[in-house]
Amino acid sequence: MAQQLTDSLFTIRDWLRYSVSRLEESGVFFGHGTDNAYDESVWLVMSALHLPLDTLDNFLDARITKEEAKHLAHLIERRVTERVPTAYLLREAWLKGFKFYVDERVI
C-alpha cells in the first residue's frame, strides 16, 4: 500500500508534504533536533538527498530519482513504524550550525 502511495510522489515538494502527513498521523515524538513534523521533514528529506538545509526553496520542484524515492520511503517508514529518531536515521545532529555524527550511543 505504501509503495502505491509513494509511486505518485515526484518532487521534493511532494515528498515533503507526504513526510509531514506521515509524521503527523503517526504521532511520533519530536525532540531530537526539531519540535514539529514540518521542520523534521525538511531535515529528513533534504539531508537524505545530500542537499543543504537552507536551500529548500531552490529545490522544491526538483524531481526525485527512483533510487532517491526508495531511500526516502525507507527512511520515512522507519521513522513512523519503528519510531527511530531522524537523527539516528541520518546519523547527524545539528548544534549552532555545526553538524555532528550521532547514533544510538550518543543521544
Show the residue positions of the predicted features.
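Non-catalytic accessory regions of SAM-dependent methyltransferases
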Residues: 1-51
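Conserved AdoMet
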Residues: 2, 39, 43-107
